[in-house]
Regions:
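Ubiquitin-like/PB1-type beta-grasp interaction modules and other compact soluble beta-rich domains
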Residues: 1-94
């Protein structure tokens, strides 16, 4: 998968986007830039469901890079590289 970043969607995100995964070409992108490219590639706007009013990750949003939570690093400024595997979980709803 040289030159590509695999992005897998889980939970409500997968249902909303109607796809389990996409691949993005890129290297050295921040997570925020990657999310914007995902919106372009899927043709759907979803960032407002993942980010708070201060453009930080909403509580309950989980983004893993190769199994590591981005919250433990630089958050949305975390850089990804070709070959990385990204897992994206939107906040769950219910009641």
């Amino acid at each position: 998968m040289a030159g590509k970043i695999a992005v897998r969607f889980y939970g409500l995100m997968r249902l909303r986007l109607r796809t389990a995964a996409i691949e993005i070409s890129g290297d050295g992108l921040t997570i925020l830039a990657l999310l914007r490219l995902e919106e372009e590639k899927t043709g759907q706007s979803f960032l407002d469901e993942l980010l708070d009013k201060d453009k930080g990750l909403l509580v309950g949003t989980i983004i893993l890079i190769n199994g590591e939570n981005v919250r433990l690093g630089r958050g949305l400024e975390t850089r990804v590289k070709a070959g990385d595997d990204i897992a994206l979980f939107s906040p769950a709803g219910g009641g």
